[in-house]
From Swiss-Prot:
GO terms for cellular component: euchromatin; pericentric heterochromatin; transcription elongation factor complex. Residues 1226-1326 form the SH2 domain. PANTHER family: TRANSCRIPTION ELONGATION FACTOR SPT6. It comes from Emericella nidulans (strain FGSC A4 / ATCC 38163 / CBS 112.46 / NRRL 194 / M139) (Aspergillus nidulans). GO terms for biological process: cellular response to stress; G1/S transition of mitotic cell cycle; negative regulation of transcription by RNA polymerase II; nucleosome assembly; nucleosome organization; poly(A)+ mRNA export from nucleus; positive regulation of transcription elongation by RNA polymerase II; regulation of mRNA 3'-end processing. This is Transcription elongation factor spt6. Residues 135-144 have a biased composition (Polar residues). Belongs to the SPT6 family. Signal peptide: none annotated.
Amino acid sequence: MSARDFVEGEAMLDEEENEEELVDDYGDGEERLETGGNHYDSSEEDEDEDDDEDAVRAVREGFIVDEDEEEEERAERRRERRKRRREEREREDEHLDEEDLELIGELNPGLQYAAAADSKFKRLKRGHKDRDSRQPSQAINDFFNSDEEDEPAPDYGRHRRHPGDEMDDFIEEDVFSDDELQREREDLEVARPRKTIGFGATDTTGLDENALEDMRAAFGDGNEYDFALAMEEEEEQQEEDVEKHLDLKDVFEPSQLAEKMLTEEDNQIRLIDEPERHQIARKPYRNVVLSEDQFREEAAWIANLMLLKKRLEPELREPFQRSVAKVLEFLVTDDWEVPFIFQHRKDYMIHTVKVPVNGASADDSSSQYTIKAEKLLNMTDLWDIFDYDLKFKALVEKRNTIQKTYDNIRSVFSVEDPIVEEMLPIATTMEELQDIQDYLHFQYASQIRDLTLTNGDTNGEVQRRKALTRNFFERVRNSKAYGLVRAFGITADAFAQNALKEGRRQYTEDASERPEDMADGLVDNDFNNSSQVLKAAKGMFAEEIVMSPKMRKVIRQAYYMNGAVDCFRTEKGLRRIDEQHPYYEFKYLRDQQLSDIARSPELFLRMLKAEEEGLIEVKVRFENFENFRKRLYPNIESDNYSELADSWNRLRREAVDLALGKLERVINRSVKENIRQECENHVAKECREAFSQRLDQAPYKPKGMILGTVPRVLALSTGTGIIGRAPIHWAYVEEDGRVLENGKFTDLSLGDKDRGIADGKDLEALVELVNRRRPDVIGVSGMSPETRRLYKLLTEIVDAKDLRGALYTDDRDEEVSDRLEVVIVNDEVARLYQNSDRAKKDHPSFAPLTHYCVGLAKYLQSPLKEYASLGRDIVSIQFKPGQQLVAQELLLKQLETALVDMVNLVGVDINEAVSDPATANLLPYVCGLGPRKAAHLLKIVNMTGGVVNSRFSLLGVGVQYPAMGVKVWNNSASFLYIDYESADADSDPLDNTRVHPEDYDIARKMAADALELDEEDIKAETDENGPGAIVRKLFREDAQDRVNDLILEEYAEQLEKNLNQRKRATLETIRAELQQPYEELRKHFVFLSTDDIFTMLTGETAQTLAEGMVVPISIKSIRDDHIEGKLDCGVDALVGESEMTDRYDIPVRAIYSLHQTVPAKVMFLNRKTFTCNVSLREEQVSRPSRPAADRAHAGEWDYRQEEQDREALEAKTQDGGRTMRVIKHPLFRPFNSTQAVEFLGSQSRGDVVIRPSSKGPDHLAVTWKVADGIFQHIDVLELDKENEFSVGRTLKVGGRFTYSDLDDLIFNHVKAMAKKVDEMMLHEKYQEGSKDSTYQWLETYTKANPRRSAYAFCIDPKHAGYFFLCFKAGEHAQVHSWPVKVIPQGYELQRNPYPDMRALCNGFKLLFTNMQSGKRR
C-alpha cells in the first residue's frame, strides 16, 4: 500500500496490490523480532528457576529500587543462607527417615506397601510434569496467557490467605475475637506440622521399653537441641512474615494508586498541616528558601509585573506595592489561601484616605471627614500573585544554579567576570537567566568541562554535545587568531551597552594596521593562512555578540516592539483550506502586529494548530529589520576617517551582520513561544471568567421564596427524538435531591373541544402528577430543535390546565400560588451526567435519558454542585472559542480557581457534606482543603460519630483522630458552617456565619453593644449560658437590626490602635452576618438567551452557521412554489420560488427529489424559531460569503496570492472537466475529504458519508469514522454504469470485495468493519492510548511479572483501519508490534485472515511459537 493512501482525504487504492508496501512500512515482523532473541526452553527455565526467585520477588514487591541496595543484599544473603541450611536439614531428615523406614520395613514387612506407594506416586507426578512440558499444544495455549495466573503448588508452610487480604491496607485496625484467633492458630498448626527429629514410637521400632530406655540414656532422645532449632525457626518465620507483608503498591498498579490518591506522597499531603493546593503547587520548589532581601525583591518584582496591566493613578502605586507585599506575606509566611485572604484580610487590599469635610485640615482630629476607599486588588489578582510567587521561585532556583556554577569557576580558576556579576542580580526573566547561562557555557566551556569531570557529573549526551559545539570557538580563543578578535577595538559587551543606551558611551579604537595585514602575522597550526584567521576572528567576534546577555536583551526588546506575524499556506494547505474551512480566516493573513495578536489570542493559537497540522507556516518577523541593523552600526564603528578605519569598520559590520542573522533565529524561537504561552494564559483566564459567571448563580428561586431556596423540579426531555414519535422521559426531584418519581409520556397533545379532538392519553397523568407533587418549576431541554416544540407544548398545557406551584404566603400574609414556569435548562452538565458512572451508581435502573432529566433538575437546584461534581471532566464543557487549544492542565488549574472562589463564597454545611455526596463534592474546593484532605475530613467525622457540633471540634489538637491541623483549620473554619439549633444550648450561632473564629470575640462585643449590655450583664449571661449566649440572645430577641446603629469606624480604630489589626472591612462582614447568617450572595438563576438556546440545541455558533454560508440541506417536501428542507443541525430550511433553480425550463421535481442532499446558501437565519431561508441557485451557491477575508483590514490580506491560488485551482478543475456529482442517497454529501472529516467529527463511530471522488465519474469515495480523530477513505470503483451520473450496478472495493449497490456496500463492508473495530476496542486485551503508552504498559506488566509474556492491541492513528498488536516475550525481551488489518470478515495478521478476536489471539500465539521454533532450528 502506498504512502499516500494514509493521507487524509485520499481514497484507498487496491489493497491486494499494495499489501507488501504496508508491511514494509511497519517493518518485517520476523526480522524485527530477531533482535529480541528470547528462546523459550523449559530446561533453561528449570535451571534458572532458583536463581530468579529472589529477583522475581523483588520485582513484584516494588519494581527493584536502588535505595539501600547494600543493606537489602546483605539481608537477602542471610535469608538465602538460612534457607539453604533449612533445606539441607530437611533433606537429611528425609534421608534418615527413608533409612529408618527400610530398617523398620525389614522388621515390619506390612509397612512397606505404604512407602512404596508414596514413592511411586512421586515418580508419577514427575513423569506427568515432564510429559506436559513436551506437549507443544499446551505451550501454545499457555504462551502470552497473561490473564491465567500460574497456580503454585500448595505451600502449607505459609499463612492462610483469605480472599479479602488484598484490602488489608484499607483497614485501620482489625480486632479479632478470641474464637477467631484460636481458629487461626489451629489452622496454622494444621498447615505447618512441626517436624521433630527423634526416635519413633515403640510400635514402629520393634524395641521393648527397657531397650529404649537404655538407648535414650546412651544417645539421648533427640530433642536436646530443640530449643535452639525452635528459636531459629521462629526467627526465620518472623523474617518471612516481614517479607510477606503487603503494601498497597504490592497489590495495585502505581497508576491505580495515583488515581485513587493512595500513594505515599498522597498520605503525606493529607497529614502535613499546610493547604493542599499550596503543597501541590509548591512541590517543585520545596528546597527553594528565600532570604529577606529576596522576599522584598519578589514583592517588587510581582508588583511591577502587575502594574503593567493595571491602570492606577500615580498616587496609588506605592499603596499597591505595599498591598502586594502584604498579600505575598499572607500566602508564603502565614500559609493562608486566597479565599481566606480575600474574605478576612480585605483591609490590606483597600487603600483608604480620610477626606476632610468643608475644607478642614486632615490633621485635625476633631474635624469631620469622609472615607475615600480605593480597591487595589481583586480575587483574580490574588490568584495571579500566587502564580507569580511560583514563577519567582523557579527564577530564584535557576539563578542560584547559575550563581553556584559561577562561584565554582571563580574559586577554582580565579576568574572574575563583571558581565555575570552585573547581569545576574538584575535578571528578571527566565530568558535573561538563560542568556547568562549560555554566556557562561560559551565563555568558560573548558573550565566548566573540567569542573564537571572533577565532580563526576558528566550530564550524559547533553554535556558531550555542548563540548563538541564549543570546540571551534575554544580553538580560536586558544590560538593566535584571537589577537585579531581583540583588535576589533571594542568588546561585544561594550557594543551591547552602546546599543542599550545605558551608561557612558564606549568608544571603538582602530588597530595600527589593516585586518588583512594583521591576520598575516597571526597564522599558526590551527589557522594556517590569513583568510582562515580573518574568518575565524570574525566568526568568534560574531559569536561573542550572539552570546552577550546585553545584546540579546537589545534584540529581544526590539523584537517585541517591532514584531509582526505572517501566515503562509503550505502546498497541503492550498488544497485543504477552502473558503468554508475555519482556517481560511488566516490563510493569506499578513502583517499582524503583536498588539493585534494580544487582542485576539485565540486566533494565534489556531494559527499554531494549523501549522502543527502542516497547513500553514506561521512566521514571526522583525519589521524594518534593515533599518534596525543600520542603526546598530554606529554603535560599533570607530569615529576615525581613514582607509584603515574603513577596513576595520567594514569587518565590524560584517561581524554584526553575521551575529544578527543568528540572533534573529534564536530570539525568534523564544518570542514565538512566549506569545503562545501568553495567548494560552489569556484564553484560559477568559474560560475562568466565563465559568465564574456560570457558577455565580443561585438555585432557581421558587415564587414567594427567598433567594437560595432549593426548588422542587419536574424535568422532561425527548432527547434527540421527535414529539409524537419518541417518548418524553421525565423525573421529579425533591429539594433534597431525591428522585421520587420518574417515567415516560408518549402523548401530551392538547385537545380541542370545539373540534371534538380529545386530549392526549398521557395529559391527564401529567396534570395529576403536577397537582400531587406541586413542583416549583418545570425544566425542559434536549439535543435537537424539537425541544423548542416541547417547551411550547408544556407552556400551553400549563396555561390551559392552570397548573400551579406550591402555596406560599405573600406580603399581605395570604396564601397564594402562581402558575408554573416552564424553563429551558442549560444541559451541558446533564449531557455529561447521563452516561456517566456516577449516574449509573446513583440510579442503576434508570434509562440514560432519565438520567439526563435528573441532571437537568439538579442543575436547577444547584448549578454549583453540578459543576463541582464533574471533577476533571469540567474541561469537556466549552466556555470560550479556542479552549481546546489550551493545555489541559493549565485550563483545569484556572477552572479550579473559579470553583474555589465560588464554593468559599457560598460555604459548605459540613454535616450535610457528611451525608450528601453532592455536597461532599464541594469540600475539595474549600479553602485549605483539597481532594485528599476533604476525604480525610469526612473519614474522621464519620469515625467520631458522623456529626460536627462546632467548628472548634474540627481542630485536631489533643484529640485521638485529628480532622485537620491548625493551619488548615484557620484556612477553612469560616467556610464550613454548622446549622444553628436554638434548642441546643451548646450550639453557637456564629458557627453558622461567615465570621472566622478569630473574630468571634469582636462579633460578641458588637452583639453586646447592640443589646446595650454592660460588663456585668455580659458576664452573667456568659457564665450561665456559655460564650455564645450574647449572640443567641440577639437572635432570640430578633434584635439583629440594632447592629446597624453601631459606629464601626470607632471599632476599627480601636482594633488597629490596640491590636495592630486592620478590621474595618471585616467589621462590615460581621455586621451583615449577624443580621442574615450566610446570606445568599450569588446572582439570580440565569436563563438562557436566544443565541445560547440555539447553540445548545443545534451545536451551531455564529462562526459555524451564518448568513452567506453554503451548507448541505436534505429535501423534505417539494412544491411548485417552494421547497422545504432541513439542515444537518435540525434547523428548518425554506426555499422560495425565486431561489429554487436557475433553470426555469425544467420542472423542479425533475431536478430535485425527496431526501436528496443538495448544497444551499443561507440567505436569512432566525435563531429564535430555528428556521432559515436558503437559495439553491447555482449563481448563489457558487459565491459563498467570505467573512474571514471581509474582516481583514486593507494591507493585511494577501489578495494577490489568493487570486493566484484560485486561478491555479480553477485551471486544475477545468483540466479535469468535471461537474459536481449528486447521487440520490441519504448518506450522500457533496463534500470533499476535509468536509467529510469535519462532518463526521461529532458523529458516532461507524457513521458514513458517501461523496464524489477525485478520481473521475466512475469512482465514488466513502468516508467512515473509525474512531475519534481517525477516518478511513475508501475508493469505490463503479462498473456497469448506465450513464456518467448514475451509480454503477457493480461496486468494487480494493479489487477484492464486490457489492451490488451502495446499501449493500455500506452494510456488508463499512458496517461490518465498524463492528470488528468495536469488537477489537471492547476486547480485554485492547489498550486505550497511543502505541508508546501500550509499550509502557507492557514494560510495567513484565516487570511486575518477570516470567510472563504479554501482548495488547492499540489503534494505529496514522493508518485508518489498522491496529497494532504489541507484545513482549518476557521481562528482558524487546517490545515488538505487528499490524492488524480490519476487513469486513474479521481481521488480517501477517496476511492470515481470522474471523474474530479469539481466533486472532490464538493465531498470533501460533504464529509466534512457530517463528520461535523456526529460529531454534
